[in-house]
């Protein structure tokens, strides 16, 4: 079965064909340069069984790529003076103080240093979609690592912690999905192609996930329990697609992700719409405290920033995103990724529906060929 490739440049088309030849099912890429969309590409199938190709309307589960957008919501509240990043979370969410969590700060949650990476022991896809159920259980957590002292990646719980902080500090107390829609998506013109909970009317646009669940990953802290594990078995379920999961549940396309991160690459403003100040955006590439220390979940150092984004650190970061320190990015399970090059005013998003794409046995990561093609096109634009 041959697959259709659409690309704005023959170099992108060639790279997409190489990616399909390596076994990826469907993929979409978009790049913005100096605030304008300059690269578009789609290839492969959104649903193999129905022979439905990936096109501009196809939306994909992007897993932890979601986290970078959720972090933006916190910074919007900080920009409005509704919170400070060094505030204890309990200042805004009093119930959170239970069981030794009273001193955990907003920044510690943003940087995965709050000590509570675990999910509720009895979580199911249906319960994960019940915001109040999740929030009540998180409020009663006891830290499993010393808050502010250990790195421990919050695989899933991250989004509810930050989302509830945003909800509590919002004068209107909007549900988190409504907040990001109104404060980010609508203002940047991407609200028709990015969802925190896919409405019934848009389910037919969602790409089917393929590949393995990688459920052999050791999870002794219940950060990623099997009933809600990021993978095809669970995340093709309607209940998962429609849950508001701000840590790993956004469903979107590369165009929307690239546009949001173009706003960051442009210093917080795009097409006359200012979301954040340039001064705040400049802080996003700052590494978290203890960035070279072992992350208890990854069991090795992880280049996470202080304010909700991965950052470039020599020898630690994904080489795909660039080679200087003024870059922020947000990767997800299966290989979806978006980054903003704050120096060169470039944003790039790659999304796909093949869960093995992020785990390559090839000496070269699957996306490297596409990254090179993108940079060749951008180099021509730079002259």
What does each model-found stretch correspond to?
Residues 3-62, 82-84:
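Short, conserved catalytic-motif segment at the N-terminal edge
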Residues 8, 12, 62, 66, ...:
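Hydrophobic (often cysteine-bearing) scaffold residues that line and stabilize catalytic clefts
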Residues 10-17, 35, 58-86, 161-166, ...:
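Active-site SXXK
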Residues 38-41, 338-339, 345-354:
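Short, well-ordered beta-strand elements
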Residues 47, 99-322:
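Short, surface-exposed loop or secondary-structure junction motifs
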Residues 85-99:
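Short, glycine/proline-biased beta-turn/loop segments that scaffold the active-site neighborhood
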Residues 244-251, 325-339, 352-358:
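Glycine-rich phosphate/pyrophosphate-binding beta-alpha loops
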Residues 266, 270, 285-295, 358-383:
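Short, gly/Ser/Thr-rich active-site loops of penicillin-recognizing serine hydrolases
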């Amino acid at each position: 079965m041959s697959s259709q490739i659409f690309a704005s440049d023959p170099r992108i088309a060639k790279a997409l064909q190489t990616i399909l030849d390596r076994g990826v099912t469907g993929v979409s890429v978009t790049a913005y340069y100096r605030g304008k969309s300059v690269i578009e590409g789609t290839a492969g199938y959104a649903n193999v069984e129905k022979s439905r190709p990936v096109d501009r309307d196809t939306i994909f589960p992007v897993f932890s790529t979601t986290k970078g957008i959720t972090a933006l919501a916190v910074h919007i509240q900080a920009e409005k003076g509704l919170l400070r990043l060094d505030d204890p979370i309990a200042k805004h969410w009093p119930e959170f103080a239970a069981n030794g969590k009273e001193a955990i700060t907003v920044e510690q949650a943003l940087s995965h240093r709050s000590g509570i990476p675990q999910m509720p022991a009895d979580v199911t896809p249906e319960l994960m979609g019940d915001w109040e159920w999740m929030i009540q259980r998180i409020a009663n957590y006891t830290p499993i690592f010393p808050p502010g002292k250990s790195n421990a990646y919050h695989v899933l719980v991250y989004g509810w912690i930050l989302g509830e902080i945003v909800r509590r500090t919002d004068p209107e107390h909007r549900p988190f999905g409504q907040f990001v829609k109104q404060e980010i998506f609508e203002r940047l013109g991407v609200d028709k192609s990015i969802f925190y909970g896919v409405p019934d009317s848009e389910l037919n646009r969602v790409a089917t996930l393929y590949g393995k669940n990688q459920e052999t990953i050791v999870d002794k802290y219940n950060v990623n329990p099997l009933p809600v594990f990021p993978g095809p078995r669970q995340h093709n379920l309607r209940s998962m697609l429609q849950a508001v999961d701000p840590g790993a549940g956004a469903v979107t396309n590369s165009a929307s992700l690239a546009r949001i991160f173009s706003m960051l690459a442009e210093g917080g403003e795009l097409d006359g719409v200012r979301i954040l100040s340039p001064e705040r955006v400049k802080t996003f590439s700052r590494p978290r405290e203890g960035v070279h220390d072992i992350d208890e979940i990854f069991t090795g150092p992880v280049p996470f920033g202080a304010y909700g984004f991965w950052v470039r650190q020599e020898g630690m970061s994904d080489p795909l995103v660039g080679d200087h320190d003024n870059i922020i990015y947000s990767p997800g399970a299966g290989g979806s990724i978006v980054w903003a090059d704050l120096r060169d005013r470039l944003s790039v998003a790659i999304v796909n529906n093949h869960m093995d794409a992020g785990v390559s046995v090839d000496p070269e990561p699957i996306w490297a060929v596409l990254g090179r093609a993108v940079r060749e096109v951008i180099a021509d634009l730079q002259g």
